[in-house]
Amino acid sequence: SDVYKRQLFACLTGLRKSDIRQLTWQQIQPYTNGRMFVTTRMQKTKEIVHNPISDEAYGLLGERGEGLIFEDFKDKMLQGPLQRWLTAAGITKKITFHCTRHSFGSLHVEMGTDMAVIQAYLGHKNITTTQIYSKIAAQQMCQVVDKITLKRKEA
């Protein structure tokens, strides 16, 4: 369904609901290397971002058309199916459409993407905003805790 595709597109791009709601086909264009890019003025910050999107994300958009990519994008149409999917999966935590943006940032941190790259992709002016979105996994913290030591290396 379109709702399902919107949700997955948001997960793969980190775009806000307000930006996806107004996304048009004219904003998605190939770059010189053939990679598809989305260029949009973020509704919240008014910053212009020019970001590549994965082939998988582009594939979710379906056949290229004119005007808005996702028509009839209303909050009620999103939240109802999302809650049904969560219930069916046995998930009781409150999840909203915006959680896709958090997931995008958090997954990139877990995969080792540089924080400055995540910041630029999400269009954050301040790195501390990115750090809030991207909660560093405890496992990663455990991996680095022993890297600094007072012990001398044996010769």
Locate the predicted segments by residue:
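Short, contiguous acidic/charged loop-to-helix segments that flank catalytic cores in large enzymes
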Residues: 39-48, 67-74, 93-99
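Conserved tyrosine-mediated DNA breakage-rejoining catalytic core shared by Y-recombinases
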Residues: 13, 22-60
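Active-site/catalytic core of tyrosine-dependent DNA strand-transfer enzymes
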Residues: 52-92
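Short, small-residue-biased leader/transition segments that mark boundaries at the very start
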Residues: 3-4
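Catalytic-site neighborhood detector that most strongly recognizes the C-terminal catalytic loop/helix
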Residues: 42-46, 75, 122, 126-147
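C-terminal secondary-structure termini that scaffold catalytic or DNA-interacting sites
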Residues: 148-155
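C-terminal catalytic core of tyrosine-transesterase DNA break-rejoin enzymes
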Residues: 8, 12, 18-19, 101-125, ...
